[in-house]
Amino acid sequence: MAQSKENTATSPRSKAPAAEKSAAAPAAQAGEKRPRTTRRPYYNRRPRRPQQPKEAAVPIHIYPLGGLGEVGKNMTVYECNGDMIIVDCGLVFPDSDMFGVDMVIPDFTFVVQNKDKIKGLLITHGHEDHIGSIPYLLQKFDLPIYGTRLTCGLIRNKLEEFGLAGKTKFVEITPKQKIKLGCFTIEPIHVNHSIPDAVAFAIDSPAGTIIQTGDFKIDYTPLACGVTDLSTLAEYGQRGVLALLSDSTNAERPGFTATEQKVAAGVRNLFARARNKRIIIATFASNIYRVQQIIDLAVEDGRKVAFSGRSMVNNTAMAQELGYMHIPEGTLIGVEELNQYPPEQVVLITTGSQGEPLSALSRMASCSHRQVRVGPGDFIIISANPIPGNEKSVTKIVNGLLLLGAEVIYESMYDGHVSGHACQEEQKLMLTLTRPKYFLPVHGEYKQLKKHALTAASLGIPTNNILIAENGSNVILTKDEIKLGEPVTAGAVMVDGLGVGDVGNVVLRDRKHLSEDGLVIIVATVDSKTGKVLAGPDLVSRGFVYVRENESLMDGAQSIVENALDRCVEEHVRDWNSVKTRVREALSSYIYRRTKRSPMILPILMEV
């Protein structure tokens, strides 16, 4: 019973006096925390800490305005936190059905609408498909251009033709130099390509790091400038790359791209084969490495060197001025001096490797070059493979040169060209080094983009993290997702002479129509009150038939027009558009029955 009373006395629930409770309290707290028996007053309560909302991931928008689904016209806009930058601004040469068009450039509507947000234009390298549209963009608004030394030099040359070089701000950059533009920090990374000073860009933003490779390959024995900076690419891969935008040009080709050293061996053998003949070599004017190789071989062989073609002359002059090309004193001569030397003592380096109609080699093949006449004493080398779509043009030039008696070496007849773009194994290495979360294949037709996407998937990148975008896509990236937003304006703007954008699909359709079936013009003078024919109708044709051999056809056509005009008078048709339509339809039907052709018919009715 005593034990029971003791327990009752120390129990928290016992009704013992207050003094007895306070005496027992220390014993109760010795081994454990005393439970609270009262609540704090509301005015003394500790407020609950509000739960912090999860911070929204910062998005970055990528807007490709060119270069997807096509080879050329490369242009990409990045936007983050209200700041924008542009990478590249190139052109593409017209398809064969774009009659009279000189070049095609991106649609600048979107960038003009956002010009106040744009902090600068960054250029990966100096090829036309990456710099060719810059003059047309600068005609819209001014912005600073960031590029390596040679790239800026080539752009400056181009802008001088447009009178824009003096007022354009150029910022020369070097690999590993950080550039701060708004919320973006950009680092150029050296890559191999068929032109010196090519770079990729690592673009840091609050959303993460994006790497855009530009045009690249991985050449372990390059002629100059060193190997692609694989260590910097790997460092970014270790830190974490949000997305990779990579060159897809050679995505269908297995293996590695051959080294430029291979070309030197092939051309050296051809120099020996030429013996006592004059050597003419056509190559890309922008391929400074290739031109330097040819110059070095010419010096070894004791030959003088001349250049032909405006872009070849301009590019080589710029490369010499900036120290990218070295020509021994006394080696370079003018093209007008070629005939002052024996054939075995000269080499002519020229444009025209892609069969361009107005190029120097094309003019030689058509005997319209003012200084150079091709004949049996010439040994001609085309040191480039035809770009898809140019095969017929190149073949036409080769045939023309052969007919003149020259010996012509082209395409697969020797190792005279290697690509400047990465093949599958190099693309895999780029993906493996950078380890991107998201992958966007760029710079290629759809089949090449698709193949590059499959290559990325084979390396373990989830298919949900691979996106084949289109020109005008609004690609939205965060650390958590990749998605498409509302598309922006993008497309092709055709340049014809001084006209920019004034040639559209309707004009091209008319030009195609004229090229296929020709033109027939109807000229008649009619009374403005009665509609009766006062003079004519006369018919004039161009590109339709040879009139002297088709007089019966043209006489019949004139009768058809007269009858159509008479019926309009009889039926009191006074609306001149209706009259023209009736005449056009009647003549078109007659001509098609007689010839199975549909020339463009243009009625001209003059009222008196």
What spans do the regions from the language model cover?
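A glycine- and charged-residue-rich anion-binding loop/surface
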Residues: 68, 92-102, 106, 117-118, ...
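Short Gly/Ser/Thr- and Asp/Glu-enriched loop/turn motifs at secondary-structure junctions
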Residues: 174, 470-472, 597-601
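C-terminal tails and terminal domains of large nucleic-acid-associated
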Residues: 572-608
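Hard-cation-handling environments
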Residues: 253-383, 387-556, 560-572, 580, ...
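Conserved hydrophobic residues forming the short capping helix/wall of the S-adenosyl-L-methionine
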Residues: 159, 456, 591
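His/Asp/Glu-rich metal-coordinating catalytic cores
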Residues: 40-122, 127-341, 359-373, 392-396
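Short glycine-rich phosphate-binding loop at a beta-alpha junction
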Residues: 144, 440, 602
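Intrinsically disordered, low-complexity RNA-associated tracts
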Residues: 1-56
